[in-house]
């Protein structure tokens, strides 16, 4: 008998009728009498293996019967087609070799567990179907981001994690004592350094972890999350919005192409993602967005997760989560809201020449109530105006002197944006909280594991 070694579970469909060897872990088992059903996983997928007492030596059947949940095992068996099975195949076991026995009872049993218990055991929960599916989608999105920007002619540009200054204000910074002499902060964004990169290379993007000391417990916030931040020079506000739409539609298409099995595990309605894959995202001004929100509130036409007493937004106020949710349900695909009041946006955003009260900025709001996934703007390129804005925010000019150099020498209109990776993954996968979209979430009350 020829045995094909080291076959991954996701490749079993290519070996129907053949005998293969699989290295896996036992997720669950059942059966009685002469038949045992073993549910196996190997990271690439899941498969059911059947052990019939008449087909294997007694010691193999007993070894299968004694297996404990999450014990590692090497299984040799024939691949059989079965339309009812996940992946369309199952494994008829001919031999089975357990690895080391577990040292204690595995804590995440097949019964239902609460989210706090599962997060306490996140290092083990990662092995189960739901996080497996979510994090494989994350991997797909990360790979697609890199591919997209490579195709668009960008270079990856690594920004530092330690920074002497704030880009989005000082209230959300993690402060670090540098040997008792100087203060530094964990970076809120790679944007400022990416601007330097754009003026050197034309098109750059940063991609890495970001840290915000937000004392928020909402389903949209983490203390540590990942952002992709492209910067382009020269570029306009219009160019920036076009790039955002191309990126997001590319990511959704790629997930639909590559992650059908993962989305099925999550029960995601892929029809709701199709419009986002097609592009043609609506664009409305901040003022137009307020009108849409007011109309929905006045008519009582509200999404299920928005309270009926929600108040309209006054002009000059930022959109809250309920207002973004209303906008997200008004459209069947992401909507770009542009030209917010400059007073509620960051100091580096270019004023609208047609109305200086406004900034040439935008937010992309995901549908189905997932809220903002992108924030971007054309950057101020005038030295005098940027210097005045920094001073107006009460920020130390000394910390931004290098940033002002970008306007002293070879300044040009340029633009960029930041996209929150976990928010995008939460929307695409249809999960309720972004804590599941990152392997080990860091929140106000959670630093372990």
Swiss-Prot record:
Q: Which Pfam families match?
A: tRNA-synt_2, tRNA_anti-codon
Per the record, the domain of life is Bacteria
Going by the UniProt record, its keywords in alphabetical order are: Aminoacyl-tRNA synthetase, ATP-binding, Cytoplasm, Ligase, Nucleotide-binding, Protein biosynthesis
Reaction catalysed? tRNA(Asn) + L-asparagine + ATP = L-asparaginyl-tRNA(Asn) + AMP + diphosphate + H(+)
What's one GO-annotated cellular component? cytoplasm
Q: What is its EC number?
A: 6.1.1.22
Sample GO molecular function, one term: asparagine-tRNA ligase activity
**Localization per record:** Cytoplasm
Q: Which GO terms describe its biological process?
A: asparaginyl-tRNA aminoacylation
Which InterPro entries does the UniProt record give?
Aa-tRNA-synt_II, aa-tRNA-synth_II, aa-tRNA-synth_II/BPL/LPL, Asn-tRNA-ligase, Asp/Asn-tRNA-synth_IIb, NA-bd_OB-fold, NA-bd_OB_tRNA
What family is this? Belongs to the class-II aminoacyl-tRNA synthetase family.
Q: How does it assemble?
A: Homodimer.
The name under which this protein is listed is Asparagine--tRNA ligase
Recorded source organism is Deinococcus geothermalis (strain DSM 11300 / CIP 105573 / AG-3a)
